[in-house]
């Protein structure tokens, strides 16, 4: 579980201008620099607050189902001569660890005044997790997905739509994840004032 102490340790690391240590840094296209600066400012203003931490941890537990259990794999432990445990992130709401990321990002986006969420997905797990938190936080969601991936992952497309997300088929190029990323970035570049790209 993340604590306020952990957040303060992470935030006390060198972060000015995106630098982390001697060789750290960031390189992003010019149009994305301002929204990333706004996101960094929102993160520093919102995430360390008691209000955000309490809501985030409440939602992780109540909505997400955290903490997930550990399973002691006795047979494997005996075979390998050490204790082996499996962490059951598959028991989170939605069936995957993706919720850990999307829940925090979407909550931060809402607190920062963003009005919609966009994402790209290949197999559909990230899109499904984004759709879940968008529905829970009452934020519209648009998920970009390559046409070929839509055909392969019909059940996840159904789940995203069931939760209210618009799934946009990307039909250019190889009709896969790379093209879905391009489409999502184009949407974000046009709508960055009110949109958060997960």
What are these regions (language model features)?
Residues 2-198:
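PLP-dependent amino-acid enzyme catalytic core
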